[in-house]
Amino acid sequence: MATVQEKAAALNLSALHSPAHRPPGFSVAQKPFGATYVWSSIINTLQTQVEVKKRRHRLKRHNDCFVGSEAVDVIFSHLIQNKYFGDVDIPRAKVVRVCQALMDYKVFEAVPTKVFGKDKKPTFEDSSCSLYRFTTIPNQDSQLGKENKLYSPARYADALFKSSDIRSASLEDLWENLSLKPANSPHVNISATLSPQVINEVWQEETIGRLLQLVDLPLLDSLLKQQEAVPKIPQPKRQSTMVNSSNYLDRGILKAYSDSQEDEWLSAAIDCLEYLPDQMVVEISRSFPEQPDRTDLVKELLFDAIGRYYSSREPLLNHLSDVHNGIAELLVNGKTEIALEATQLLLKLLDFQNREEFRRLLYFMAVAANPSEFKLQKESDNRMVVKRIFSKAIVDNKNLSKGKTDLLVLFLMDHQKDVFKIPGTLHKIVSVKLMAIQNGRDPNRDAGYIYCQRIDQRDYSNNTEKTTKDELLNLLKTLDEDSKLSAKEKKKLLGQFYKCHPDIFIEHFGD
């Protein structure tokens, strides 16, 4: 069966969307062609850029699926980069509504589409745990009439406007309902595709730049070393030609057992076993209880094995140790939203394999920590047991106190569905820079400033004088209102202040 990418390539969509194929006087705002073009472009981008692979969902494995949050990331980046709506800010929530529209019109479907045997109206979820699959239709052009193929983007968009159900509320109306109106510019620049290496380097650079905005770092050495590292393009796993049949059989038996149990806990645990060495997997398989219905014994066996493995290996977040402290400090100060974005940026810098392994482990930790799940230890809360056993598998930073480490680990567990999303701010920065590179402009000029803003000498002098004066007034006010100082100490300190800054003193107290 051909992959999504192969089928999209067979449609020659890059030529279809090239400037040579646009009609004279083309404008995105034209009806209905303009919206048809936009939707066709969105569908093409989603089909060719979202990662489609075999995934597990609701205790079963499904082929050719993609994650909801990644679909939002792809469409979000595409809309901003191509500026169909000018320079208007596009909230992530509105991109979710675009995905909902695509699912309503059968561009893709949820996996599965039924819950407990009943039809349920599909609702798109911006989550790393929600899976979707592109829909297929009978190939009417085939003489056999038995083959299936994906809708082409052009056929999808055309069908959206021809459907009688949509005439009353066309996709143009959807844009307006989203408070997004297509730009009237007749020049919508769909430039040549950049190389994956260039795109990865831009993502790396801007992720680090955005991280520096959010986290106060005493030293930049770790970030600079991270920036010097060449971003690796995810490569498919190489299958060994010589597979140990015994190990392969043991892993297959464990997966089959998990699929037969319909238990989220077991499903998450078995997914983690993929990263355990063969010897440990064989030991687990051979140590299975004789009574297959004793899931409590199975869970105890799996939890002990996974905990033992991760307690003896390097932590998954062993990079950018200075950032750990910065995120923990944000959490201590109650800045949860900023801490979440900083965490998303930190995880974006992980390589593909470590990121996927960490996602599976964090998901298992969140499920196992649920108080309604299998009791891990009789006298301890599940949440505390998971935190104690897996903390060092995530962060082992000597410069981070135990309290801050615990706070960071619990925060990751509580937000495991959100920490792997890409922040909208980063999306916009990267898209603007990639667009500038595509158009041959200076990317640093168009992408705005990240670290500082250049000002002239006059503004610098004025800002320096004003800031110094404001801080001196704050200091004087603090001294005057400090009730802990004795009258003698206060008089002495105020006298010293008057000698150094008489103008500030008189301005505050008067003559």
From Swiss-Prot:
Domain of life, source organism: Eukaryota
Annotated DEP domain residues: 46-136
Cross-referenced Pfam families: DEP
GO biological process, one term: intracellular signal transduction
Classification via Gene3D superfamilies: Winged helix-like DNA-binding domain superfamily/Winged helix DNA-binding domain
Cross-referenced InterPro entries: DEP_dom, WH-like_DNA-bd_sf, WH_DNA-bd_sf
Family matches, as SUPFAM superfamilies: Winged helix' DNA-binding domain
Tissue: Expressed in liver.
Similarity section: Belongs to the DEPDC7 family.
Protein name: DEP domain-containing protein 7
